[in-house]
Design a protein with these regions (language model features):
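An acidic-aromatic
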Residues: 64-120
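N-terminal leader/targeting segments and the immediate start of mature chains
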Residues: 5-55, 63, 67, 102, ...
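Edge/loop elements at the starts and ends of beta-strands within beta-rich repeat scaffolds
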Residues: 32-39, 51-54, 61-66, 83, ...
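Gly/Pro-enriched, hydrophobic low-complexity segments
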Residues: 128-225
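Amphipathic hydrophobic-ligand
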Residues: 52-56, 79-84, 173-177
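Hydrophobic lipid-interacting interfaces of membrane-associated proteins
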Residues: 44-50, 75-78, 90-97, 145-147, ...
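Surface-exposed beta-loop interaction hotspot
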Residues: 116-133
């Protein structure tokens, strides 16, 4: 009886079979999601799981094509930290545990900020255009799969631009995290949320400003310790 009351796991983001596509096409698409110049994205954030709730402000400084300095702070400076991400790897984080608790899935952080990491060299690349003839918004799907990990991306277009970017990470068939990002008229992130399967965790952010003329000082890439 108890088993019957358990909530069903969410359906896959992309519940349809996909065909292999050229890797170069996926790389070209991922490149279009990056800012053309170093950019600072300032946001309000909220995190909660089964045990805690936190909120505060943060800044993601992006140096395309693959580098990010991520700073966050809670109310009155409590719970502050920083990290540098290169591609899908954390170069350093301080405090390490706090950052990895806040954002345990780096590809999903990039996706939440409206940016897609290109497929790894050994990844299988699949895709589809789900546009139908009924006048519905165009939806384009990409899947990058390797070594038991699968990353699905679903981009919804309207009036010739992407307005919604969704992503899902599955490991050995089990969902790890799913993100949903609304984009503004310039296809930049406006708001986002990442839901994690473990512990009912959720990370949300609302963008308050985007500076496309920012200068990222070299010292910011170095560890704070």
């Amino acid at each position: 009886m108890l088993a019957a009351c358990r909530p069903r796991p969410p359906a896959p983001l992309v519940p349809v079979p996909l065909a292999p596509v050229e890797r170069d096409s996926a790389i070209a698409w991922a490149r279009t999601t990056l800012p053309p110049t170093p950019t600072a994205i300032r946001f309000r954030w909220h995190y909660q799981d089964e045990h805690v709730k936190y909120a505060g402000r943060g800044t993601a400084r992006i140096a395309p094509p693959d580098s990010m300095r991520f700073d966050y702070a809670g109310p009155l400076g409590l719970g502050s930290g920083a990290a540098v991400v290169i591609g899908d790897s954390v170069l350093w984080a301080d405090p390490d545990k706090n950052f990895r608790s806040l954002v345990p899935a780096i590809p999903m952080l990039w996706a939440a900020l409206g940016m897609i990491r290109p497929p790894a060299a050994e990844a299988d690349v699949l895709g589809a255009d789900l546009t139908d003839a009924g006048g519905a918004p165009r939806r384009v799907v990409w899947r990058f799969a390797q070594l038991g990990d699968t990353l699905d991306y679903l981009a919804t277009d309207s009036a010739g631009r992407t307005v919604l970017l969704e992503a899902e990470w599955r490991r050995r068939g089990e969902r790890v995290a799913r993100s949903r990002t609304s984009l503004d008229a310039r296809q930049r992130p406006a708001s986002a949320r990442i839901d994690f399967a473990s512990g009912g965790a959720r990370f949300e952010l609302t963008v308050v400003a985007i500076d496309t003329a920012t200068v990222i000082a070299p010292v910011l890439w170095r560890s704070r310790r």
